[in-house]
Amino acid sequence: MMILLTLFVAGCQPKSEKTALSPQDSLMLAKVNDFAVVTLTTDLGKLTEKEKQMIPLLIEVADIIDNLYWLQTLGDKTAFLDSIKDTITRQFAEINYGPWERLNGNKPFVEGYGEKPAGANFYPADMTKEEFEKWNDPNKTSQYTLILRADDRSLKAVWYHEAYKDQITRAADLLNKAAGFAEDAGLKKYLELRAEAFLTDDYFASDMAWMDMKTNTIDFVIGPIENYEDELFGYKTSYEGVVLAKDQEWSKRLAKFASLLPELQKNLPVDPKYKKEKPGTDSDLNAYDVIYVTGQANKGSKTIAINLPNDEKVQLAKGSRRLQLKNAMKAKFDKILLPISEVLIDSGQRANIKFDAFFSNVMFHEVAHGLGIKNTITGKGNVREALKEKYSSFEEAKADILGLYMTTRLIEMGEIKDITVEDCFITYMAGLFRSVRFGAASAHGKANMMCYNYFEDKGAFERLPEGTYRVNMDKIRTAMNEWAAKVLMIEGDGDYQGAVTYLDANGKIRESLQADLDRLKTARIPVDIVYDQGPKVLGLN
């Protein structure tokens, strides 16, 4: 699916007639090459014949969902891409799912486009916040409705399954067909219920079935799931599709950690009133090869771990599933994090940067989404509703810092034996440099910047004269605990105004850091990865 444009551009010209790229083309080519190409494969020998037959059907569903995400974020994919005559710019637009550079503050790079609409394509372009808030409709804040203009120019809410009826019906049919190949009873039930959910926009039963599913090898994360794209209110969810194959050996290594979640919740570094909720005991941790990705999960920066479902009712009843995407994680570690450490981490601490520490930090980031608090202690409803469009940034900040906290705790408890606390902190610091390059446009980017700036202000690290950074082991633990408490309190109090004020002041990249991030660009270290994927790549012709 993805091509190496450096080879493409060079290969298209006769040797005697090679011409220099224009400055604009050179800029676009550099931006495309900021994404290292990673081929998505898995060991087909570990799959049954029926599982191999099922995967192309799941990929077909994921492709339908990909087109729906384009509609949600911008509009018709084909019409937009056809309007871009330059091949290199079109390739970059495909990576970004539109004309805005996701990892550079959503700056437009296609002529004719201005600032990215905060409400994406979920709301009318001319709708104001005030108009929406005054409008009385019980479905307006649903995760699964589009807000459109009626013939009389008033607002109306339209369910996703109605707005996208033809595509949704086709996707549901394919899910039922895929269920026919499922040998695992749990997977079969989940796929059938997910098909039904597509047609009703009621995902509760299928989320519960997904959590009950334990012995499957193939997994499929599919549907309107995350609300990152809606930066106007944070209500609307975007479609995505992720096809996965479980790594059974690594998953066995992780299974023991799920039983420790209640104990970890009790020991969070915050006042007891913010940790009274008990996480579900049915939570599980598994490692996977990601083998196909579309929609929201494929735009810009690629996810390396997943924590679902988001439904608080399901989480309290069943816990949540943390999916560690091991092949994607290893690719980012090798192609991005290690090269960054050679430029920015003190040479005396580079030996502490280890994949197992990176894996643990990321894994417990996902675990941390299920910890803390889901419902405010101030009577303001659940945290997601109370913090509105700031929720995603603070939820990611919570997961980041509690993930670090839990990894260090488990090392000290003797539950994690192959890495040290020093490995954990120093690898986390290197990981922060990797993450802040996402920019401050996304929820993850804002979360990373708040953490980085808090650590800097507390002296958790220092910048050495030669331009590298050294972690202060005495101060970073205190900074970690204090930042964790601050985030948990903002969430637990449902302190929307506090969230707005803090994020505005601390969610930006400071000049001193930007200068060092620019050095990574000079060193031509990739910003992220892009996938070469599909049935042929997998060997499923």
Give the positions of each predicted feature.
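Contiguous, non-catalytic segments that form substrate-binding/exosite surfaces or channel walls
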Residues: 160-350, 354
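Post-HEXXH active-site segment of zinc metalloproteases
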Residues: 373-397
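N-terminal helix-rich structural modules
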Residues: 20-190
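Long, well-structured alpha-helical subdomains associated
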Residues: 404-503
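An active-site-proximal "capping" alpha-helix that borders the catalytic cofactor pocket
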Residues: 184, 392-409
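Extended, compositionally biased alpha-helical segments that mediate assembly or anchoring
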Residues: 484, 488-541
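C-terminal motif of bacterial Sec signal peptides marking the signal peptidase cleavage site
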Residues: 7-11
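Active-site recognition of the HExxH zinc-binding catalytic motif
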Residues: 48, 360-374, 399, 404
